Regions:
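Pyridoxal 5′-phosphate
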Residues: 1-169
């Protein structure tokens, strides 16, 4: 649903429509978008959608997979039959409850979250562009995650490359 590097919101509805035309299931990784923008699986028309609790200030190591009714999946690990036979392992009940609580808080706060996150982003972006005239913002100018800011500096590509090499990235 959203790119975690540059923050661009992807056109999920349109992409899902295209896959439906060709009889292909559509999965969206909505981990970055959860709690920041509305995610309505019916409006998005996705077949599968992934979420992660830690992006909602919930416990790490807990996630969710939405599966549209009628979508048939096959397990890749066999065993105890948890998760309706799709995953074998003991469920992390405490983590699941924590995820549920975090999701509830995120849902309650969603309406004001975008403006809360965008105000400092815009101040920072303006300050950077004013102070560092060779800077530029990555990603779409308006279709982007609330609070997300990713920028670069013209003419500094070699310096960045050297830094990444020095950091062994």
């Amino acid at each position: 649903a959203a790119n975690n590097v540059v923050g661009t919101l992807q056109p999920i509805e349109e992409l899902a429509h295209l896959t439906k035309l060709h009889g292909v299931l559509f999965h969206s990784d909505a981990v970055q978008a959860a709690g920041k923008i509305p995610l309505d699986v019916n409006r998005l028309n996705v077949d599968l959608l992934s979420l992660s609790a830690h992006k909602l200030h919930g416990p790490k190591g807990v996630g969710a997979l939405y599966i549209r009714k009628g979508v048939k999946l096959s397990p890749i690990v066999f065993g105890g039959g948890q998760e309706r036979g799709l995953r074998s392992a003991t469920e992390n009940v405490a983590g699941i409850v924590g995820f549920g609580a975090a999701a509830e808080v995120a849902r309650e706060e969603l309406a004001g979250e975008a403006s809360r996150l965008n105000q400092p982003r815009e101040r920072i972006a303006e300050s950077i562009s004013r102070t560092l005239p060779h800077s530029y913002v990555f990603g779409h100018p308006s279709q982007r995650l609330p609070g997300h800011l990713s920028f670069g500096f013209r003419g500094q590509e070699r310096a960045v490359g050297k830094l990444l090499h020095a950091l062994e990235i």
